[in-house]
A protein has these predicted regions:
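N-terminal pre-domain/capping segments
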Residues: 1-231
């Protein structure tokens, strides 16, 4: 088993020397400065790989090579974006980086409701509270039909939370779910963007005609297209 660590590039406050000191062997990272859909060149990959190796570590996993929204919902630019993805995969392989994570969820990449949840021993961690996410989904985002995705008990808890949640907590929830956990991963929404809820809604609207089965079909189409490159 290899001890790996998610590292968010040279701007990460956790540096590679720190990770080496605590026994980390492999790095999980990506080319965070390359816009979604653009090709990861062998030069850019090699540069980051060499930088990581200069600290006695290795680039073990790509997390992630972003799948553009147009690939997921089947937009007109899908074919070109898939071709770019295939080239990026091939370039990673040429550079010896063999494990690549991807995400096919609409709009979101990962969700937490708290990025510094305190624990009794004085430590903190990322945290997901399902009721707070449901509150965000129903009361803040106002997603059409969202109530149907939750139980009566969960809806009751959302109502109870609505009685006590502060405006500051609402803003923190928006910042955590939309900006912090999405922006640095897929670049759709960035720090400083005005009205991130409206931006999030516009992105979500791209999927208004996409049901579960269509999304699965689009995922199958994508995987079928890239698999020959992966197998090489």
């Amino acid at each position: 088993m290899e001890k790996t660590w998610r590292w968010f590039g040279k701007k990460d406050k956790i540096t590679l020397p720190m990770l080496r000191q605590i026994g980390v062997e492999g790095i999980v990272t990506a080319l965070h400065d390359v816009p979604n859909g653009e090709i990861w060149t062998t030069e850019a990959i090699s540069d980051l790989k060499s930088y990581i190796e200069s600290y006695g570590l290795r680039w073990s996993v790509v997390e992630s090579l972003p799948v553009c929204e147009a690939i997921k919902y089947g937009g007109t630019e899908r074919e070109q974006l898939i071709e770019n993805y295939k080239v990026s995969l091939a370039n990673l392989g040429k550079c010896g980086v063999k494990t690549v994570c991807y995400n096919f969820m609409p709009v979101i990449d990962w969700i937490r409701t708290d990025l510094q949840h305190p624990w009794a021993d004085g430590t903190s961690s990322l945290y997901y509270d399902h009721i707070r996410f449901a509150y965000f989904d129903i009361r803040i985002l106002g997603r059409e039909g969202a109530e149907k995705d939750y139980t009566e008990e969960e809806l009751h808890k959302v109502d109870e939370l609505d009685k006590v949640i502060t405006e500051a907590e609402k803003e923190a929830l928006i910042d955590t779910i939309i900006v912090k956990t999405q922006g640095f991963v897929n670049g759709n929404i960035k720090e400083g963007d005005k009205n991130p809820v409206a931006i999030f809604k516009r992105l979500l609207a791209l999927y208004k005609d996409i049901d579960r089965e269509t999304l699965r079909e689009n995922m199958h189409y994508f995987l079928s297209a890239i698999m020959p490159v992966c197998e090489e």
